[in-house]
């Protein structure tokens, strides 16, 4: 099973988060509407409605930023998104300085911010 990793840059904290067409194709199976997200470990059961806008270039819209802002994500943290069996996408944040962040940060070189990796790379996340 693959997960999508998205490294956060300053712009992502104030604007919509960009995504590539390749990620949309390979990870989201070209689905851009009616995406349902949940926060990993969230017990209130809230489901966030997300879309992928494509006015100039693809960007997450809808309630996407609300998900990771509740976790107080910041520049340099990495979003981890995986698809659950029920079709929802589960989002968690790998915070800088944590074991999981240290394990996965090496997949990004320079200003790269998108990666799809095998979930086995994450270990017991």
Locate predicted features.
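Acidic, low-complexity intrinsically disordered regions
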Residues: 1-125
């Amino acid at each position: 099973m693959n997960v999508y990793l998205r490294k956060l840059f300053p712009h992502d904290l104030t604007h919509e988060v960009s995504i590539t067409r390749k990620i949309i194709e390979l990870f989201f199976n070209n689905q851009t509407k009616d995406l349902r997200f949940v926060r990993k470990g969230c017990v209130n059961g809230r489901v966030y409605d997300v879309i992928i806008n494509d006015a100039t270039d693809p960007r997450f819209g809808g309630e996407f930023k609300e998900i990771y802002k509740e976790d107080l994500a910041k520049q340099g943290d990495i979003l981890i998104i995986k698809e659950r069996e029920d079709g929802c996408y589960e989002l968690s944040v790998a915070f800088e300085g944590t074991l999981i962040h240290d394990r996965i940060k090496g997949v990004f070189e320079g200003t790269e911010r998108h990666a799809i990796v095998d979930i086995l790379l994450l270990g017991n996340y």
